């Protein structure tokens, strides 16, 4: 079966509208999990206010800001940053794992029970979390160097969570295969990832102009919308990999 962008777009559109209720529920659940973790973190409000009120133009301005901190403030900033990274990874892994399990359950001819699906999710979660940490770290290094390497790394590593699901806990193999397959089919994988990135950018720009809306409500809308966008990307990539395995 030939793999085309139009075919994947049609299949993604069909699956999204068929399972729109479940996707919305997962997106909302991941958002509320993010909020709950944020409540338990309880960071130093002085550090949070400093971070929110300072607009860093570049890396040097951020480094200068950190250098002017006292030792206690640096320690609190480090702790806050680590906790926020963990929060983001847990939320992303929950969303990613849930959507992958949802697609796999719907795609299988033999229907799985809810208990079986939850069990699969919890078995999959630890390895997916580690993979997310590794790929996020690699991609962020790419963005720190230049924008183009960051985008390219986002594309070639995008299949790794889906390959991991099929390969069953083989992290390095998942990353290696993702790089090989995504590079070979970059004209098909690329548009999906770029659509997601552009969607995130446009959504961020639009929501930034809604200054009259309550900050917490805006955060909720933003997170749910971003989660839905990411879910669409995962559906697109999962469908690609299913067709790839059959071809």
From Swiss-Prot:
The chain crosses the membrane at residues 20-40, 85-105, 114-134, 137-157, 188-208, 218-238. It is found in: Cell membrane. GO terms for cellular component: plasma membrane. Keywords: Cell membrane, Membrane, Transmembrane, Transmembrane helix. InterPro entries: UPF0259. It comes from the Bacteria. The keyword Lyase does not apply. Pfam families: UPF0259. This is UPF0259 membrane protein BU276. The lineage of its organism: Bacteria, Pseudomonadati, Pseudomonadota, Gammaproteobacteria, Enterobacterales.
């Amino acid at each position: 079966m030939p793999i085309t962008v139009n075919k994947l777009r049609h299949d993604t559109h069909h699956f999204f509208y068929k399972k729109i209720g479940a996707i919305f529920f997962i997106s909302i659940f991941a958002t509320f999990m993010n909020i709950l973790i944020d409540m338990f973190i309880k960071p130093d409000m002085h550090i949070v206010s400093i971070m929110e009120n300072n607009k860093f133009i570049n890396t040097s301005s951020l480094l200068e800001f950190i250098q002017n901190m006292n030792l206690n403030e640096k320690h609190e900033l480090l702790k806050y940053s680590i906790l926020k990274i963990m929060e983001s990874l847990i939320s992303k892994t929950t969303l990613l794992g849930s959507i992958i399990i949802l697609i796999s359950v719907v795609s299988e001819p033999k229907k799985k029970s809810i208990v079986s699906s939850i069990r699969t999710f919890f078995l999959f979660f630890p390895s997916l979390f580690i993979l997310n940490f590794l790929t996020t770290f690699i991609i962020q290094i790419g963005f720190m160097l230049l924008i183009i390497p960051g985008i390219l790394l986002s594309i070639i590593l995008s299949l790794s969570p889906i390959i991991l699901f099929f390969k069953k806990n083989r992290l390095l193999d998942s990353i290696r295969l993702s790089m090989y397959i995504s590079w070979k089919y970059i004209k098909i994988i690329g548009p999906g990832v770029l659509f997601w990135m552009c969607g995130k950018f446009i959504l961020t720009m639009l929501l930034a102009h809604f200054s009259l809306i309550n900050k917490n409500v805006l955060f909720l809308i933003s997170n749910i919308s971003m989660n839905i966008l990411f879910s669409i990307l995962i559906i697109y990539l999962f469908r690609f990999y299913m067709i790839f395995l059959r071809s």
